[in-house]
């Protein structure tokens, strides 16, 4: 089964924010991505708004509602009160909770579910009551207990942190080891009734191996590698390439 592609727009927003100018237009690139076959858009609004701005959210929400009603909006972030209120106002189809410190450059680890289980259960319950699906950022280390604890929060999905796998480059032996651990984690999730997303440093080159090991992968969220390719091939063609790497047939 093909995985859905959600295009992360943070890198586009970061480029825009280098100047006090309205371009590149985040919503315009979101429109191109969805028109080219992406199933959704992802943003990670940080407290300092260093890339995605809070004002981007209603614009992207309206884009999906008005032009692409079958697409999904995914908002990532650490669940502060301000973040939760932002989600409640925006009503994304999915909220992906990550354990980031506000100063982190990017998400680089999953939740410690042993430590944060009670906290996450409360947050998940609040978001679900608001009609949002919740995914929890998780390390793909192959252990079962953390996945069991994630399932007990009431979340519908986990998102596998694929950074170490994405960073292997040409080290095939290491990549094989890491993708097997990711696969074991996904197997535990499936057995516990959790759907599985994945994200971080995924590329057209490394997606097929991941898809082969996790054929039930529901969604991948990709920003940096996709944006880098878009600088060479254009956004629309790049999205089509990533959709194909996800196992989708280009229309």
From Swiss-Prot:
<feature type="active site" description="Proton acceptor">
    <location>
        <position position="76"/>
    </location>
</feature>
<dbReference type="GO" id="GO:0033856">
    <property type="term" value="F:pyridoxine 5'-phosphate synthase activity"/>
</dbReference>
<feature type="active site" description="Proton acceptor">
    <location>
        <position position="44"/>
    </location>
</feature>
<comment type="function">
    <text>Catalyzes the complicated ring closure reaction between the two acyclic compounds 1-deoxy-D-xylulose-5-phosphate (DXP) and 3-amino-2-oxopropyl phosphate (1-amino-acetone-3-phosphate or AAP) to form pyridoxine 5'-phosphate (PNP) and inorganic phosphate.</text>
</comment>
<comment type="pathway">
    <text>Cofactor biosynthesis; pyridoxine 5'-phosphate biosynthesis; pyridoxine 5'-phosphate from D-erythrose 4-phosphate: step 5/5.</text>
</comment>
<dbReference type="GO" id="GO:0005829">
    <property type="term" value="C:cytosol"/>
</dbReference>
<keyword id="KW-0808">Transferase</keyword>
<feature type="binding site">
    <location>
        <position position="19"/>
    </location>
    <ligand>
        <name>3-amino-2-oxopropyl phosphate</name>
    </ligand>
</feature>
<feature type="binding site">
    <location>
        <position position="8"/>
    </location>
    <ligand>
        <name>3-amino-2-oxopropyl phosphate</name>
    </ligand>
</feature>
<dbReference type="InterPro" id="IPR004569">
    <property type="entry name" value="PyrdxlP_synth_PdxJ"/>
</dbReference>
<keyword id="KW-0963">Cytoplasm</keyword>
<dbReference type="InterPro" id="IPR036130">
    <property type="entry name" value="Pyridoxine-5'_phos_synth"/>
</dbReference>
<feature type="binding site">
    <location>
        <position position="201"/>
    </location>
    <ligand>
        <name>3-amino-2-oxopropyl phosphate</name>
    </ligand>
</feature>
<keyword id="KW-0664">Pyridoxine biosynthesis</keyword>
<feature type="binding site">
    <location>
        <begin position="223"/>
        <end position="224"/>
    </location>
    <ligand>
        <name>3-amino-2-oxopropyl phosphate</name>
    </ligand>
</feature>
<comment type="subunit">
    <text>Homooctamer; tetramer of dimers.</text>
</comment>
<dbReference type="Pfam" id="PF03740">
    <property type="entry name" value="PdxJ"/>
</dbReference>
<feature type="active site" description="Proton donor">
    <location>
        <position position="200"/>
    </location>
</feature>
<feature type="site" description="Transition state stabilizer">
    <location>
        <position position="159"/>
    </location>
</feature>
<feature type="binding site">
    <location>
        <position position="46"/>
    </location>
    <ligand>
        <name>1-deoxy-D-xylulose 5-phosphate</name>
    </ligand>
</feature>
<feature type="binding site">
    <location>
        <position position="51"/>
    </location>
    <ligand>
        <name>1-deoxy-D-xylulose 5-phosphate</name>
    </ligand>
</feature>
<dbReference type="GO" id="GO:0008615">
    <property type="term" value="P:pyridoxine biosynthetic process"/>
</dbReference>
<dbReference type="InterPro" id="IPR013785">
    <property type="entry name" value="Aldolase_TIM"/>
</dbReference>
<protein>
    <recommendedName>
        <fullName>Pyridoxine 5'-phosphate synthase</fullName>
        <ecNumber>2.6.99.2</ecNumber>
    </recommendedName>
</protein>
<comment type="similarity">
    <text>Belongs to the PNP synthase family.</text>
</comment>
<feature type="binding site">
    <location>
        <position position="106"/>
    </location>
    <ligand>
        <name>1-deoxy-D-xylulose 5-phosphate</name>
    </ligand>
</feature>
């Amino acid at each position: 089964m093909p995985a859905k592609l959600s295009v992360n727009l943070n890198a586009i927003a970061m480029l825009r924010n280098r100047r006090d100018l309205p371009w590149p237009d985040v919503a315009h690139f979101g429109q191109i991505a969805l028109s080219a076959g992406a199933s959704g858009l992802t943003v990670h609004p940080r407290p300092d708004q260093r890339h995605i701005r809070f004002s981007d959210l209603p614009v992207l929400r309206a884009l999906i509602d008005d032009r692409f009603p079958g697409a999904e909006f995914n908002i990532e972030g650490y669940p502060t009160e301000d973040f939760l209120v932002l989600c409640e106002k925006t009503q994304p189809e999915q909220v992906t909770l990550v354990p980031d410190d506000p100063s982190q450059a990017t998400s680089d680890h999953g939740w410690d579910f042993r430590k944060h289980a009670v906290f996450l259960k409360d947050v998940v319950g609040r978001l679900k009551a608001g009609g949002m699906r919740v995914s929890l950022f998780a390390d793909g280390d192959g252990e079962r207990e953390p996945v069991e604890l994630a399932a007990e929060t009431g979340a519908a999905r986990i998102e596998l942190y694929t950074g170490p796998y994405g960073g292997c480059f040409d080290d095939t032996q290491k990549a094989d080891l890491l993708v097997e651990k990711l696969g074991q984690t996904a197997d535990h999730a499936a057995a516990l009734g959790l759907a599985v997303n994945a994200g971080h440093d995924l590329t057209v080159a490394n997606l097929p191996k991941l898809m082969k090991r996790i054929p039930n992968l529901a969604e991948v969220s990709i920003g940096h590698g996709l944006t880098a390719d878009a600088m060479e091939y254009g956004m629309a063609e790049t999205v089509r390439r990533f959709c194909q790497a996800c196992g989708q047939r280009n229309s």
